[in-house]
Amino acid sequence: MDARSWVFVGDRKMSAKEIAWLNESLSQFVSSWQTHGKSLDAVGFVLHEAAILIVANENAVKASGCSMDKINHFVKDAGGQLSMDFFNRMNVLLPNSNGDFELARYEMGAQNMIHSAMQEWKELADLF
């Protein structure tokens, strides 16, 4: 399957009520989402209480620039309704030791990942 995905990470985690509202809004959006008059085969849902994931199957119909603009408008409007910013690309979801994901700023996440990688390299070097 040829698929295209879009991920928008918010600036905070959402409540259960907000997630339910957003999942319903996403379902309505993707069910009516079109490109040049043709319906797109897509799904959308909230990911890890803090992000929006939209995936389109592009085998039959490919998403166009206009249809991608519609995603951005939808996410911007949803963010306005929720008082959230889904367009700050410094927000990331990082796995934690519990197997869950937590919201972090890229700078902090990058430092932690670099530190972790350096520790692994040091441990490997100590073996030799």
Task: Identify the function of each model-found stretch.
Residues 38-51:
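Short edge beta-strands and adjacent turn/loop segments
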